[in-house]
């Protein structure tokens, strides 16, 4: 295993971590160059300078989509007639198998807060909210205490560091809905409405929280901002081994590996390096059957893809998405039907129910998979699953929930079709008629 020695020059997100993994509170954070970036920005830069810096750095969103952060910031409404603008931190980390944001919030909370302060300064925002997953009880306590610490030290409030910059920061805990990870559903929830996605346009940058210009960024994205402001664009670009994406990324492996965890690594590090050098390989007696690059809502890949660089373009070319870059290893003793069925049950339960394809399609997928799992499937079940994947593909539903939900299913069928076909009942195979239209797969056929 590689022995990581985090330094400020090579590990901007994690070099402040304590060896005992206790929280880095504000006094220790300040001793480790904490809030230096904020002081630099407020004293020597204007908001436009910070936006330009982030755009030039190539920082991409770390929530999964990989959209340019600087470009997203530049889309904020330039209409200064509206003095009220909002910055929202999406900390509603509910993607199964993902835990990177919790890692940052519980260990280095002031890095996130400083990132929000810098982002707010760049966007002329005076109020921010951290929308936290409700189940993150420890993170809630730590963030509340950290916000109060920042207020006491004069980093949050009015006329921060005598600069004329004002910023209030509030913590809001969610009610346990996965769909709040979608930025407009998050906004609806924060307003006290049902957590349904909104139609776009208008985009939040123009019409967001309470109808005001709003920017929504992920925890890890915001945590990258202080180091970029402090050390500059050229330094940040050199951190990466990829020609596609700049900087570093929290990456990890879970599943039946010897050392599951999360590590800050350069973009371009291969999945094999992470699995073998950091996660120490599969447990004794097991070998890798498949893996998901970045959460439950990403397509499965197989062993031959382990040598791909972990960046947005390389993983996309292989037919999946980098997502959160917290990978899940699937071992050879895992039944793919059972695994995918479990994933689809989660996504079916978490559908907001707004659009018909998602509301009706995902439960039907679960029903078919349950039959296949019991080896009671029907002749056309696998074909119907493939058709449902097409029916729930991008552009056919109101948001990206359903398209993401069927990614693991379509890829599992692609690579492990025989396992799914093995779930078809021999008896029903002999006596079977085609399913006409969208209806239950439980039917009787004429003999």
Curated annotation (Swiss-Prot):
E.C. number: 7.1.1.-
Binding site for FMN: 174-221
PROSITE patterns noted in UniProt: COMPLEX1_51K_1, COMPLEX1_51K_2
Keywords: 4Fe-4S, Flavoprotein, FMN, Iron, Iron-sulfur, Metal-binding, NAD, Quinone, Translocase
Broad EC category: translocase
Binding site for NAD(+): 61-70
Signal peptide: none
InterPro entries: NADH-UbQ_OxRdtase_51kDa_CS (IPR001949), NADH-UbQ_OxRdtase_suF (IPR011537), Nuo51_FMN-bd (IPR011538), Nuo51_FMN-bd_sf (IPR037225), Nuop51_4Fe4S-bd (IPR019575), Nuop51_4Fe4S-bd_sf (IPR037207)
Pfam families linked: Complex1_51K, NADH_4Fe-4S
Disulfide bridges in this chain: none
Note on how the cofactor is bound: Binds 1 [4Fe-4S] cluster.
Entry cofactors: [4Fe-4S] cluster; FMN
Binding site for [4Fe-4S] cluster: 352, 355, 358, 399
Known function: NDH-1 shuttles electrons from NADH, via FMN and iron-sulfur (Fe-S) centers, to quinones in the respiratory chain. Couples the redox reaction to proton translocation (for every two electrons transferred, four hydrogen ions are translocated across the cytoplasmic membrane), and thus conserves the redox energy in a proton gradient.
NCBIfam families: nuoF_fam, PRK11278.1, PRK13596.1
Name recorded for this polypeptide: NADH-quinone oxidoreductase subunit F
Annotated organism of origin: Buchnera aphidicola subsp. Schizaphis graminum (strain Sg)
